[in-house]
């Protein structure tokens, strides 16, 4: 069986935290900011943690990723 490879798209989008959780960035942050409130834009800047339902699948894509 061939080696598993790290999914490069996922490797660019997710980072592991010190406790082993996965950090991600929010969607809706690339354009069309005029109709978004300042509060919404401020909240979108912060990182989010991957939900437990998605964790197993994403963690499998990042098999060998250290950080």
Curated annotation (Swiss-Prot):
* Gene Ontology CC annotations of this record: cytosolic large ribosomal subunit
Q: Which GO terms describe its molecular function?
A: structural constituent of ribosome
Annotated SUPFAM superfamilies: L35p-like
Q: Which domain of life is it from?
A: Bacteria
Ranges in a coiled coil:
none
The record ties this protein, via Pfam families, to:
Ribosomal_L35p (PF01632)
State the InterPro entries in the record.
Ribosomal_bL35, Ribosomal_bL35-like, Ribosomal_bL35_CS, Ribosomal_bL35_sf
- One record GO biological process: translation
Any idea which UniProt keywords this protein has? Answer: Ribonucleoprotein, Ribosomal protein
Q: What is this protein called?
A: Large ribosomal subunit protein bL35
Per the UniProt record, the source organism is Shouchella clausii (strain KSM-K16) (Alkalihalobacillus clausii)
